[in-house]
Amino acid sequence: MVRTYWAVIIACLSLGWSAAQTRELVLFPFAQGAAVQPTDEFNVNVEALNALYAQLKEIPSVYVLRFRETNPSITRAIEENRIRRDRLNPPFNEREADGTWRAARVGALLDVDLAFAGRIEEFSYDPTKREAIITISGDLIDVRTGEVIVSVAESGRGRLGSDQEDVNIARIAAVAEVAQKVGAALRERLAPPVQQPTQPQEERRPDRKRERATVTLFAIILGAVLGGSQF
């Protein structure tokens, strides 16, 4: 019975410690630049968010949630006039009139630690090269301090194979590549690789035999010198 009691206590403490170490990150919808090629059959904003979300949720000790205007905390803030509805649209990585990042302001309403907001700068498909390209820029922002932890700008490309005709295959490949690059850049700041401690070199034991031989040789030489000096 006592063992069970202590096991429960330890499990609760461990769970609490783990939760305390986990940071929450909100992922905002992207704004779109003028170089985004419109297409009806491929929603690049949704696809890019899905791909990046899949990358970010693999970062250790980071819990990722997507921004939704229907979140109860956001709904309550609108009802209490703590934020206007028109401030809930991208771009989120722009500063408000008071100098705060919009992403940080909205993130504070969600009570999260981090926010990532950005823009799809370019998205197009070249039928001549049979290639899709996408460029995404963005900022990882500390919601508590309002500081930018890291800014990123990455591109991804996808090309159709010789036997492929569906252009969305190239688009999906391009989105996957850029999401992987952005995710890697954020992972590097949020969960840097642990450096393995260098192996200490073994302390070399003194060679007693060599020491004794050296002392003996020195004594013989010294004796010969002293003996010769007597004549």
Each model region followed by its residue ranges:
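N-terminal secretory signal peptides that target proteins for export/translocation
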Residues: 1-2
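C-terminal/domain-edge helix-coil "capping" segments
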Residues: 20-26, 32-35, 48-50, 55, ...
